[in-house]
From Swiss-Prot:
This is Photosystem II reaction center protein K. Coiled coil: none annotated. One of the components of the core complex of photosystem II (PSII). PSII is a light-driven water:plastoquinone oxidoreductase that uses light energy to abstract electrons from H(2)O, generating O(2) and a proton gradient subsequently used for ATP formation. It consists of a core antenna complex that captures photons, and an electron transfer chain that converts photonic excitation into a charge separation. The chain crosses the membrane at residues 40-60. It holds the Pfam family PsbK. One of its GO terms (cellular component) is chloroplast thylakoid membrane. It comes from the Eukaryota. It is found in: Plastid, Chloroplast thylakoid membrane. It is a single-pass membrane protein. It comes from Citrus sinensis (Sweet orange). SUPFAM superfamilies: Photosystem II reaction center protein K, PsbK (SSF161037). The gene is psbK. Signal peptide: none annotated.
Length: 61
């Protein structure tokens, strides 16, 4: 039980510290990549949804 709370504490702390990265700007040399960087967090969600579509295609075996 203690391990679960420790893991939750670590996750919350890392989320709080990494939230400052959400507002960071890319260097000017990479400014043309801004649209791609904005879409990148959505990509894992698309793979998650693809798993359901794939399972529906094979009738949830």
């Amino acid at each position: 039980m203690l391990n679960i709370f420790s893991l939750m504490y670590i996750c919350l702390n890392s989320a709080l510290y990494s939230s400052s990265f959400l507002f960071a700007k890319l260097p000017e040399a990479y400014a043309f990549l801004n649209p791609i960087v904005d879409v990148m967090p959505v990509i894992p969600v698309l793979f998650f949804l693809l798993a359901f579509v794939w399972q529906a295609a094979v009738s949830f075996r």
